[in-house]
Amino acid sequence: MGISCSHLEETMSKPPDCLLRMLRGTPRQRVFTFFIISFKFMFLISILIYWHTVGAPKDQREYSLPVDFSCPQLAFPRVSAPGNIFFLETSDRTSPNFLFMCSVESAARAHPESQVVVLMKGLPRDTTAQPRNLGISLLSCFPNVWIRPLDLQELFEDTPLAAWYSEARHRWEPYQLPVLSDASRIALLWKFGGIYLDTDFIVLKNLLNLTNTLGIQSRYVLNGAFLAFERKHEFLALCLHDFVANYNGWIWGHQGPQLLTRVFKKWCSIQSLEKSHACRGVTALPPEAFYPIPWQNWKKYFEDISPEELTQLLNATYAVHVWNKKSQGTHLEATSKALLAQLHARYCPTTHRAMKMYL
């Protein structure tokens, strides 16, 4: 085609006068130049979206962890309640990190007589082919923790999300994993009822007295990182309908926090959120209940705090959301006085012991 900068890398690394000559060239040359620039731009955008969705690369030390863990002696009563506390892993990851372990352990310790069910999409149905890693080994120490495979097609079956999922699984979208997680938690609670928690929560108190409840993140938006609902509740049915009717997988949060906010405002016939609100049997608790530290201030979790200040900060908190999307990759010294380290030591001591041993 008579273009002197023929290869992609060469084209984008030439000085500006080369690019100017190409832009002044024949129509074919200009089309080719536009294609190269567009390709490089889209490639960069794809990388940024991936990092925004999945996060930065994990700490390499996690890949050298042992696969077995010596369980401590645990005095847990016999499980009497049905499986009503759920954690979901909708990616193919099957090796829980330390925050994931702490989330599940803290829930198990706060609810010793209830089943804490961890559903993981990457787990095979064949129980003889289960992965061996530190996270699975440690969580298996707790008699009330059940780790099971997650079949998304089966989960969405007989819900308004079935047709959506059959199409969505075959197309690319920038926020595919978060959207899938948003869909799964609503379908799960609609089908079975109970409590759902994100895997970056640390549970401080028993949550079983909370029914048909969610949390306010800020004055503008609710958050679905914690949800507690009865089986087949009408509010969840409206969420399922809105998920499909107003679907947009290209806007961050549109199918999650924004969806819950839209439905809640319609449910309560309100225009804006208050500090807390309850109507028609559904309660939105104030930010201090689950989001005592706003996401903008996530670094506070890694700052030192006195035990007295910690108690005062979390006095009205049921569970602490750590904003893993922002904080992942940040080094935490397990023996420090950092807020997060103190939470680990107090509410997930088994995970904390493993952190001190291996980090």
UniProtKB/Swiss-Prot annotation:
Instruction: Supply the SUPFAM superfamilies for this chain.
Output: Nucleotide-diphospho-sugar transferases (SSF53448)
Q: Where is this motif: DXD motif?
A: 198-200
Instruction: Return the Pfam families for the record.
Output: Gb3_synth (PF04572), Gly_transf_sug (PF04488)
Instruction: Spell out the molecular function terms from Gene Ontology.
Output: galactosyltransferase activity; lactosylceramide 4-alpha-galactosyltransferase activity; toxic substance binding
- List the protein's name: Lactosylceramide 4-alpha-galactosyltransferase
Topological region Lumenal: 52-359
Q: Which GO terms describe its cellular component?
A: Golgi membrane; membrane
Q: Which UniProt keywords apply?
A: Glycoprotein, Glycosyltransferase, Golgi apparatus, Lipid biosynthesis, Lipid metabolism, Membrane, Signal-anchor, Transferase, Transmembrane, Transmembrane helix
Q: Which residues lie on this side of the membrane: Cytoplasmic?
A: 1-30
Q: What is its EC number?
A: 2.4.1.228
**Regions that span the bilayer:** 31-51
Q: Does this entry carry the keyword Cytoplasm?
A: no
Q: Where is the signal peptide?
A: none
Q: Gene name, please?
A: A4galt
Top-level enzyme category: transferase
Written domain comment of the UniProt record: The conserved DXD motif is involved in enzyme activity.
